[in-house]
């Protein structure tokens, strides 16, 4: 109907929008695809741009790619989803951006220590099963393995027989603008709290969980 409506007194929405990044739209610079991959804190807004392999902080003075602080190439390689890369048809389904039942990213803020935690839950097929697996978008066991058997075997995402765990957790200190450490806990769900935060994990193990690109040395 070519009709324009203004909410309230119009003072807020009558102003032209301003870009927070000087980049073409086609670059999708600073895009966030993760529902749980963003958190607002007293130190600014932190969010994950998984497809670009970057992590940003926005504190009112433009976007700061904090992933560039000494870990640019590590995040560029290990932040994008390995599962989606192997199963492109899984993108935008109920199994991606879903760290509880599938794969996805989360961000949590510890208000006591002023530390931000970035968590990624991800899996990739073991080399022996590449080319034998297909993704089927359904409410349960969305991956089918077609081996020598005539009937395909339906499996869960992350089944340790068929998948390698690519999950990791890393912490960042906004005060010193530095990455602190990797952590061997990779939660399925993280929940904010007035003090620290909560995480859930249904499967525990005594095997050290190293981030991709690193190995555990007991000595």
Regions found by a protein language model. Give the residues of each.
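Beta-sheet-dominated scaffold domains
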Residues: 1-218
